[in-house]
């Protein structure tokens, strides 16, 4: 118990130092994170809700929508290899796969290096133990998509909290819950065997991560 308390004190001190001395450079996500992600439109429509996994070193992302979400007849299951520019839309029920090229590779799981630091705020209470969360807010433009974004991440740990995307075609709000610094099964980043040999489908140059979420 004393060890746990000591570790908590040390962690709090390190966070305080980071708060005081940070030069506000974009941080990097932990090597592996997972949790729940919810996406809604600014009009209040639920677009997707499910489990995500992200490998920051390999820049790979998996999102599996809750099958019961929004009474949909089908649900989203996507695997994105951002470095390779490949997007897989997976239908495990029918063992089918759609493969597309992804020319635009920015996303909201990482802070882009050209992002602007907007503010550092406390969500909840800064004075009551375990009743607040310190976050940093970053923003930037995505000129290729005629869009801009904002991203809130924890000041200590660089974990995603929320994000927004505002473009000509759509506006999206992202929320992240129960984020852990681990992924239970690394096979989630490997395309199923039935995706092998599938030909790439043509996609527009501005095809992006944000196109995955729509009414």
Curated annotation (Swiss-Prot):
Glycans are attached at residues 71, 94. Forms disulfide-linked dimers. Belongs to the ependymin family. GO terms for cellular component: extracellular region; lysosome. May play a role in neural plasticity. May be involved during axon regeneration. InterPro entries: Ependymin, Ependymin_CS. PANTHER family: EPENDYMIN-RELATED (PTHR10697:SF5), MAMMALIAN EPENDYMIN-RELATED PROTEIN 1 (PTHR10697). It is found in: Secreted. It comes from Carassius auratus (Goldfish). EPDs are synthesized in the meninx and secreted in the cerebrospinal fluid. Residues 1-20 form the signal peptide. The gene is epd2. GO terms for biological process: cell-matrix adhesion. Different glycosylation variants are known as EPD-beta and EPD-gamma. This is Ependymin-2. GO terms for molecular function: calcium ion binding. Keywords: Calcium, Disulfide bond, Glycoprotein, Secreted, Signal.
